[in-house]
Amino acid sequence: MNSYQKGKEKGDMLEVNFYDTVDDDLLKFAVIISQSNGKWVMCKHKERDTYEVPGGHREEGEDILETAKRELQEETGAVKFDIEQLCVYSVTGKNSINENGEETFGLLCFAEIREFSGELHCEMEKVVLMDELPENWTYPLIQPKLIEKYLQIQKQSYSQIQQTAKQTIAYIKKIIKPGMKLFDIRKLCEEKLLELGADSFWYWDVGAFVFAGDETTVSVSGKQYVTSDKIIENNDIITIDLSPQVGNIWGDYARTIIVENGEVVDDIELIQNQEWKSGLQMEEKLHAELFRFVTKETTFEELYYHMNEFIVENGFVNLDFMGNLGHSIVKVKGDRIYIEKGNKAKLGEVNYFTFEPHIAFPDSKYGYKKENIYYFDETGLVEL
């Protein structure tokens, strides 16, 4: 038995622990933390006024993952879903499903549900999709701790894949030189992303969008993107936008890189071309303004209007082909919501979102982009 960042919850003599693995025959339960379209999927029992995460007992001879799938289908009516194993949990102490109080083990899973049948074949009365977790839990000393573990694992996963993108940009900065083809830069970036842990690329299977010179003002969907035959010049401007993923966990990271006299200039203050320098300084200013302006209550639309006004006030234009400035990070590409007009959702209602202003001076042939992923914790806005 291997310890997995052991965490405990005590109260009424209950203790919750987490492990990476245990012997398979010890696993008697499966619990499936579930979401659908960004909402928590909670079950209400016919005989209770409380809510619970779907889950249940393993049947004789049943594979534990099949237990998870079966319980999910029976208790939520899920018919189309993606499910993944997270870790093993255990509960020690007497409770409604463990009369002797000995340590019992279960598999903790996560499921993204895409379609429900509308029928429940179990003791559940109904399924409720919630923006916020319930206050009236059926198992208040157990399931909130399982949710907390899921969120911790999720954050680690997103941080790791985003770090892969950051390391790839740092790597490519060291080897970019005049004479390199954009296609070769794309190939090197994508190979590095895979080497560092990505298993695929979430945006139309393109891992690295690479633009140079007057192409840096181009804003195009990945569906139409084709890497040009441009070659890096002795003095050049290059924008690289990365979209790695592992499983269905996304990274999203972009930077505009300046080459002067054949060398990458990493310090904005040392850039000699004043237009390029001003463009990158404005990107820094925009991200600083993001921290100043937003709260969890800020809507995507409010951020859209504020930042577009801020861009214009500072003498720039927004180049994005859709006019937006970023999007939520989700597990299904079609579920993204955008920093755009009409989006009344609050930033605090999504787990993560990108901020990626693509800007230029009016009528200039050069564009600039800086993209990070952000989220809120108890202290406020944080860069992932």
Each language-model region and where it sits:
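Acidic, metal-coordinating catalytic segment for phosphate/diphosphate chemistry
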Residues: 1-31
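Short glycine-rich loop/turn motifs
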Residues: 29-31, 40, 206-208
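Short beta-strand scaffold segments in enzyme catalytic cores
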Residues: 30-34, 374-375
